[in-house]
Amino acid sequence: MFKRRLCAALLSTLAIVTPVVSADTQVKIIAFNDFHGNLFSAGNVADVPVGGVDVFAAYVDKLRAQNPYNVVVSAGDLIGASPLVSSLFHDEPTIEVMNRLRLDFNAVGNHEFDEGTEELLRMQHGGCHPEDVNSCQGEKVGTPVPFEGAQFGFLAANVLNQQTGDTLFPAYGTKAFGDHEIAFIGLTLEGTPSIVLAEGIRTLQFLDEADTINALIPEIRARGVEAIVVLIHEGGLRPSAAGVYNSCLDDITSSDLVMPIAEIVSQLDDAVDLVITGHSPVAYNCRIPNSVGRLIPVTHAQGAASVVTDIDVLLDDVSGDIVDITLNNVLVEQNESVIPVEGITRLIHAYSDLAQPLADRVIGVMTAAVTRSNDPTNGQSDAGNMIADAQLAATRSPDTGGAQLALMNSGGVRANMGAELYPGHITYGAIYSMQPFGNSLVTMTYTAAQLKEVLEQQFPECLGRRQRTLLQVSAGFSYQFDESAPACNRIIEMSLNGTRLVEGGQLIDPEKTLRVTVNNFIADVGMDLPLWAWAQIGSPGYWISTRWSNILCNTAGPTMLTIPTLPVLANPV
């Protein structure tokens, strides 16, 4: 096989041993990704009720029963951006559930770093949160105290401690089946620093995915392991259709598609047999050419335990290499034939009971269903605009920042407040599911020229941007763009409260100052937009530490929320 020679530091591994078998050996790999602490069902797929981790566990057990030689793996974002029932307890419930589901390996994803490096290490090794009394609730729910930590292995091949050069977690893990082993290399996307808070990962370095994988191949093969599987928290976007979760577009590697994983796979050593991915909002089951043009399987389940990938691999008895692979994405459908795993049901309901008083607290009244679905033309959503409006309202007063507009990242909107809540009260739990991060708000001063430049960088080809990523904007601020114009020159109109800032692509007053509110993720160079770096010297930001739900509350009782009217952005006619 083709080998790519790269220097590699000695990296630790995890090893699991299973009973000895003979002849060609079939092994079942049970894979999922982007669980995000969804202990209960996150909704439907094509109008079919799916998920709930106790139902998911029943599917895993059913697949396990088909073959005693099995392994369960996750391709990242197991925790982070979680509903209240998990995140209120710092995702300890999710780790405890996965221990009981008998997960073997989890490759870190970007959301594993949401609460910083030390908290992620606590997820692996256990112990109570140093500050929050909501941690270590085992006595009330029937789990060990202090928090037991993960009994499965986190993997982080491309995440290094900058001081020591060691990986944060083992680069790969192995599981033995008779005389042979399968190696699982686990890693997150190299771009993780651009989508998590920098403060929590300042001691870490994130390396190129393909280079990291290829550098490990000689070490793994020197151990006599030929079967190599990659668990990577990186994928891609493709046009989605309702209920499509087990297919792949013929032109999956087309330059017209945003498919970062295709670029990574195209560089992989031919020793890699299978790539299990995460990070994308859709499921796929593909075969993508590697560095020598051989098509290798690349899979992605749908998040929130709604789809599980059932993979059968055949190990050659002589070489130990994978000689055959079959794959199938299975919908985790709720129906009468599926009996949820009782112990897991009991555990998640115990945590739900603890969270219920807070989750049920009414903080507002629905005046319309609010969704996070982005308009394909202007990139805006009802939910994103409403959050931006709330952030502007919280920081408009001179005492709280003097903001004139607010910008919100669409990736920070994690759930809908759908028709099932309308008409009716909005609860803390519903708001928390929509905005689970607990970010702070920061208001800073920019010139009109700086703001225009930030907006230009939302579009592909401007200063290395690979895909369109549009910020959600507050009411009163609008702009128009022409995507056919040259890179970094696409903003043709920009206005604030009826006052023109840009007309015909030209700034009217480049030095005009504006007070802009964003969350601290965006301010901390999130999305690779230089909002913090460009804040004017001598104009410090005003920080307000609050969850979005607090912005919507008042002492008089439930607040009527008016949903912004779309569009606030549009392509020019």
Label the predicted regions:
Residues 1, 240, 253-254, 260, ...:
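Serine/threonine-rich low-complexity intrinsically disordered regions
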Residues 23-334, 382-393, 406, 462, ...:
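Acidic, metal/ion-coordinating pockets
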Residues 25-28, 37-46, 50-65, 95, ...:
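Catalytic centers of hydrolytic enzymes
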